Amino acid sequence: MNNMNIEDFNNKRFYLFGSEWIINIVDNIEPEVDEDGYKHHYAGMTHNATQKIEIARSVKEEKLSNEMMCKTLIHELVHVICNTGAYFNYSNDEPFIEFMARGILSLLKQDLICK
């Protein structure tokens, strides 16, 4: 895990529950503006309709570290697992998704998950 380069995942395709997904590493993700006019900036985004994950290299013009981008990828992958498994309520629970992503990242760092 410690030598994982996030750029190696750019344009990587994978399959989950019969669906093909693609990971794109992008310079930034366009902020979303809510009904109150507040801009939401994201390090990652899962697009279920197009089966695409985007991971940003920077947020608000601040470059993200490789480790932060890897954590963000794991976070988005947990969203994909929940959504493709029809666990939509879990996918909408950001604290749960972040909790799972940090747990998986911790196991990866300890080389406890198969390579």
Listing of model-derived features with the role each one plays in the protein:
Residues 8-67, 80-84, 88-103:
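Active-site scaffold of zinc-dependent metalloenzymes
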Residues 106-115:
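Short, Lys/Arg-rich amphipathic alpha-helical interaction segments
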Residues 68-76:
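Short alpha-helical catalytic segment bearing the HExxH-like zincin motif
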